[in-house]
Amino acid sequence: MARVAGIDLPNNKRLDIALRYIYGIGPAISDEIIKELSLNPAKRVKDLTEEEVGRINNLITKNLKVEGDLRREVQSNIKRLIEIRSYRGLRHRRNLPVRGQRTKTNARTRRGKRKTVGAGKSTSSIKRVK
């Protein structure tokens, strides 16, 4: 297995797909890396030479923010929004959708599992004996 940016890339995958296993690298950036290093995107990870793996690793570590650094930056951005009490920060704090989605229905992923309220007895429903 080739190790790039602290991640073991799967051997049997194509290079363009395997690079996407790294947090912060998607299809566009993966293709850009392959073009810049003039590698074959259809080449399997197990067929890469040590020199090619080293070139990929150097390019990613020098030019891109990936994995732990990127996760830390995203978390600090969210924390900053919460601290300055912006609308987006309040939505994050309350675990509600941040980008304007409706919440009357849907938003189950963000709001969590439904809480069912049991039928309780009200004082007016109890019969009074005189």
Swiss-Prot record:
Alphabetized PROSITE patterns for the sequence: RIBOSOMAL_S13_1, RIBOSOMAL_S13_2
Keyword entries, A-Z: Ribonucleoprotein, Ribosomal protein, RNA-binding, rRNA-binding, tRNA-binding
Disordered: annotated span: 97-130
GO biological process, one term: translation
GO MF term set: rRNA binding; structural constituent of ribosome; tRNA binding
Ranges of biased composition (kind: Basic residues): 97-116
GO cellular component, one term: small ribosomal subunit
Compositionally skewed regions (Polar residues) per UniProt: 121-130
Superkingdom of this protein's organism: Bacteria
Pfam families: Ribosomal_S13
InterPro entries: Rbsml_uS13_C, Ribosomal_uS13, Ribosomal_uS13-like_H2TH, Ribosomal_uS13_bac-type, Ribosomal_uS13_CS
Family annotation (PANTHER family): 30S RIBOSOMAL PROTEIN S13/40S RIBOSOMAL PROTEIN S18, SMALL RIBOSOMAL SUBUNIT PROTEIN US13M
Family: Belongs to the universal ribosomal protein uS13 family.
Protein purpose: Located at the top of the head of the 30S subunit, it contacts several helices of the 16S rRNA. In the 70S ribosome it contacts the 23S rRNA (bridge B1a) and protein L5 of the 50S subunit (bridge B1b), connecting the 2 subunits; these bridges are implicated in subunit movement. Contacts the tRNAs in the A and P-sites.
Self-association and partners: Part of the 30S ribosomal subunit. Forms a loose heterodimer with protein S19. Forms two bridges to the 50S subunit in the 70S ribosome.
The protein, known as: Small ribosomal subunit protein uS13
Source organism of this protein record: Endomicrobium trichonymphae
Gene this protein is translated from: rpsM
